[in-house]
Amino acid sequence: MFFNKKNNQDELKKAAAIEAAKHIKSEIVLGVGTGSTVAFLIEELVNYKDKIKSVVSSSEDSTKKLKALGFDVVDLNYAGEIDLYIDGADECNNHKELIKGGGAALTREKICVAAAKKFICIIDESKKVNTLGEFPLPVEVIPMARSYVAREIVKLGGQPVYREKTITDNGNIILDVYNLKIDNPLKLETELNQITGVITNGIFALKPADTVIMAKKDGSIESF
């Protein structure tokens, strides 16, 4: 697929979102993620309204946008299994392992991925990396455990920074971890989740994307 618009980053995000929407089938329970790329997806979903049975949203922000467009947004507990979940990423490697959570919705995003039959990740090519970790890794933490968790993360080689004035939709805080070269995403995802006080972290390796749709500066769309 090629598009003729000026290939700035927003247009690349929009192109990836439009391509992902083509995977929507009739009577679908659709999971919708969070972030700037997903914002373009939500706009595109208007063209698929007759195919979408209901929508499960990973954040309050996306829920507001979806409801404003007239979509039936339901709680995951009532939706059951999600047929297709579409979301963006902050980083993506060749194995479709991701860093997500720059928008602080990582826990709900991870729940949606776990409950979905298929997960499509939409990115522009600036998000593609060989090794995860250049983007700071978000970790959602119970507030009273912040200092303890930070000390444990330092032992793993990271430099945690408290994301001030950010409270997640679940009422928790975010530590952004810098200077972690994530050579083994599966191992680190597990190790971080085992720290008492951690809700989850932004590595998506135990359950990576099934398909990545990437918009490139040359105007093409690559799927892998």
Curated annotation (Swiss-Prot):
Q: Which residues bind substrate?
A: 34-37, 87-90, 100-103, 127
**Where along the chain is the active site annotated?**
109 (proton acceptor)
Q: Which top-rank group of organisms is this from?
A: Bacteria
A GO CC term attached to the entry: cytosol
The protein's annotated catalytic reaction(s) are: aldehydo-D-ribose 5-phosphate = D-ribulose 5-phosphate
What Pfam families does the record tag this protein with?
Rib_5-P_isom_A (PF06026)
> Has the keyword Oxidoreductase been applied to this entry?
no
Keywords, sorted A to Z: Isomerase
Q: Which GO terms describe its biological process?
A: D-ribose metabolic process; pentose-phosphate shunt, non-oxidative branch
Q: In which pathway does it act?
A: Carbohydrate degradation; pentose phosphate pathway; D-ribose 5-phosphate from D-ribulose 5-phosphate (non-oxidative stage): step 1/1
Q: Which Gene3D superfamilies match?
A: 3.30.70.260, 3.40.50.1360
Q: Kindly give the PANTHER family that the UniProt entry links to this protein.
A: RIBOSE-5-PHOSPHATE ISOMERASE
State the function annotated in the UniProt record: Catalyzes the reversible conversion of ribose-5-phosphate to ribulose 5-phosphate.
Full protein name? Ribose-5-phosphate isomerase A
Source species taxonomy:
Bacteria, Pseudomonadati, Pseudomonadota, Gammaproteobacteria, Thiotrichales
Gene name on record? rpiA
